[in-house]
Amino acid sequence: MAVSLFIPLYAIAILALIPMLFAKRKIGYCITAFFTGLLTVLCGFYFCGSAPNLFNESQKSYTESFRSLVQHMDKTYVLKEWKAVDFAALEAKYLPAVQTAEQEQDAVKFMNAVQEFCNELHDGHIYASCEIGPEEEKQSAFHQHEYGLSMVQLDSGDVIAVCTAEEVRKLGIEDGTVITQWNGKPVLQAAAEDVPDYGIPVKANADRIAPMYLSALGGDTVDVTFLDKSGREQTVTLSDLGECRTAHEAMDAFSHAPKFETPEDYQTFLDQNFSAKMLDDKCGYLILNAETLSSDPMGLKNIAGYLMGDQKYAREIFRTRLNELKAQGMEYLVVDLRNNMGGFDEIGCALCDLLTDQEWYGQGLGIRKNGQYTCVSDHGVHGTGEFKDLPVVALTNYNCASAGDGTSLYLSKLPNVTLAGITDPCGCNQETGGTCVLSGGVVTVGYPVGLVMDETGVPNVDTKADRISRNPVEVRIPLDLDAAMAIFRDKKDYELEWAVQYLEQ
């Protein structure tokens, strides 16, 4: 869940203009001035209540700002106890690298240390935003190379080449070729030992995509061992072809991720939210790529639903979409949550309202004090029963995060809904709001400070230190050779095709 901390400030600025419209009307001016003042005070209190989690350490040195970051997170990171985080141990582990970066005045080394520190927490809501150029990026510990292929692990355990370039195909490695070694190591061993920790919350998700990351790791050259068409091992040396493209292409194909190359692409993605259509004469299709109302630019409807625990506006949109599909002959439905960017869990609950006639616990908003959790507001699913008998498959993946993670969980509780995917949801759903700007503004770290709990009083989705998914898919979509070729070579939406076939059967 991501609630913008600055919406109250925007609201205050706009509210201040309202009395001007009634400047020549004595009664109207008094009334609007009173309510404007009241709303301004409320918005001010809301912002001030959030402000303690904003920390500016930009005037301090690398070492001092890093130590301050650790202290702030030790006090305010909402999942410190849940994930059993030892901040003192992490500070001791990464402080030498930070001190070296300070001695050498090396911003990239500082960035690396902070990023690796953040990744140790395995929280999808923790980020380290870094201000570096393309040349500095090449020195990053997370720099990726381009060797003209990517790799994916099948359910069988085999690792195959995908998205192969012409330079690689000439050497005998084609889409579907089994890769056995990477730079002299068994390929899965190399994926486990050499791929950096990217902070992915669910370890099973990280393991699944590790070969894709591995395909971009090496030096100016990399030795790749594969099985030729006769089944014999061959080894070739691949050269770095420049800027990394293939690994990104493979990840986009695997997650069915949208392209964000232009502002128009991003707007198209947002415009698809809440959209619906018929895939055939029986199967409806609903996209939910963010739990926000794009028709609400000020965010007031979003916030109203959050505060009231009831998103009536979203529920009415869902009701309209589903009734339109029903009128076109819908007998079953696919809800697409893949790459869901999150927002407000109440929107996910509003969809569930229509798909059940039962009462279900949704989320509990709480506070953390002295390492203890206290729930202060319960939000739930209040079934209307309108589509309680509609068979539904909800597609999710490792890029479905935050409120999308929550929506995956809530939908999976309904008996007529099957949560499915090749991977599990991301594994994070706490409220963001903690921000710390480090030395010189080189790195800004964000992390969650608001608590979202389940009915037992613990974080509702987020993984513990074991990194085991707590809202796994109910049905794992198979990934065999044919599926991989459909995804990576033919660029088909294999998961969606699978979902339709599943519902038909």
For the regions a protein language model found, what residue spans apply to each?
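C-terminal "post-core" interaction segments
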Residues: 5-6, 10, 19-20, 26, ...
